[in-house]
From Swiss-Prot:
Organismal lineage: Eukaryota, Metazoa, Chordata, Craniata, Vertebrata
Name the UniProt record assigns to this protein: Tumor necrosis factor ligand superfamily member 15
Pfam families: TNF (PF00229)
Keywords: Cytokine, Disulfide bond, Glycoprotein, Membrane, Secreted, Signal-anchor, Transmembrane, Transmembrane helix
Stretches that traverse the bilayer: 36-56
Topological domain spans for side Cytoplasmic: 1-35
Tissue: Specifically expressed in endothelial cells. Detected in monocytes, placenta, lung, liver, kidney, skeletal muscle, pancreas, spleen, prostate, small intestine and colon.
Annotated function: Receptor for TNFRSF25 and TNFRSF6B. Mediates activation of NF-kappa-B. Inhibits vascular endothelial growth and angiogenesis (in vitro). Promotes activation of caspases and apoptosis.
Annotated signal sequence range: none
InterPro entries: TNF (IPR006053), TNF_dom (IPR006052), Tumour_necrosis_fac-like_dom (IPR008983)
Gene that encodes it: TNFSF15
Domain THD residue range list: 95-251
Record note on quaternary structure: Homotrimer.
SUPFAM superfamilies linked: TNF-like
GO BP terms: activation of NF-kappaB-inducing kinase activity; cell surface receptor signaling pathway; immune response; positive regulation of canonical NF-kappaB signal transduction; positive regulation of extrinsic apoptotic signaling pathway; signal transduction
């Protein structure tokens, strides 16, 4: 029997096994597993970096919130020498004055030079407040700023018909009346006219009254002085303090 097979008892038979149908599936599964593992290894550093970034951002936000809380807490218990923001200045604290008329002493009138009026600064409706002072016909400005300046002067006379005045030879009776608010500055040699008002009295009959009101805003400097000049001091109506007055206040 052994001889028919051509094999000796000392030899080992070798049999080649052919692969069966469908035996390539294990290889395909192994390739998919390797691809999935590769993707995981590639994505793992990205996921780790993203996690680290989110963690650091959260810690940073918590740190900033802690710093803000400490700053607010420090301000709450800050010492009194630190800067404190003062409230807006109230109008009642600003310099202001209102002067009323007093009886005037006639003075000699020079050409192109109008006499200045005297004022009451304490009695009746008159006052000076918050470092605004009155002295020797002048209002003294205590601090620089924008001021509203005003004055009303009421004139009165007995007759002002220009033709009759000229025919009678009475040159002391005016054809017009003038009021000027003047500023005097130590650094400037000449007075500055801030406001001027003029009215004709030729068309007015006997026993006439003429008020002239002036008012406007001006930028003034500390130390400036204000006064009111008139063309004829003898015609100023001083009978009532609400007819002739002068004032200024810081805006």
């Amino acid at each position: 029997m052994a001889e028919d097979l051509g094999l000796s008892f000392g030899e080992t038979a070798s049999v080649e096994m052919l692969p069966e149908h469908g035996s390539c599936r294990p290889k395909a599964r192994s390739s998919s597993a390797r691809w999935a593992l590769t993707c995981c290894l590639v994505l793992l550093p990205f996921l780790a970096g993203l996690t680290t970034y989110l963690l650091v951002s959260q810690l940073r936000a918590q740190g900033e919130a802690c710093v803000q809380f400490q700053a607010l807490k420090g301000q709450e218990f800050a010492p009194s020498h630190q800067q404190v923001y003062a409230p807006l200045r109230a109008d009642g604290d600003k310099p202001r004055a209102h002067l009323t008329v007093v009886r005037q002493t006639p003075t000699q009138h020079f050409k192109n030079q109008f006499p200045a009026l005297h004022w009451e600064h304490e009695l009746g409706l008159a006052f000076t407040k918050n470092r605004m002072n009155y002295t020797n016909k002048f209002l003294l400005i205590p601090e620089s700023g924008d001021y509203f300046i005003y004055s009303q002067v009421t004139f009165r006379g007995m007759t002002s018909e220009c033709s009759e005045i000229r025919q009678a030879g009475r040159p002391n009776k005016p054809d017009s009346i003038t009021v000027v608010i003047t500023k005097v500055t130590d650094s400037y040699p000449e007075p500055t006219q801030l406001l001027m008002g003029t009215k004709s009295v030729c068309e007015v009959g006997s026993n006439w009254f003429q008020p002239i009101y002036l008012g406007a805003m001006f930028s003034l400097q500390e130390g400036d002085k204000l006064m009111v000049n008139v063309s004829d001091i003898s015609l100023v109506d001083y009978t009532k303090e609400d007819k002739t007055f002068f004032g200024a206040f810081l805006l």
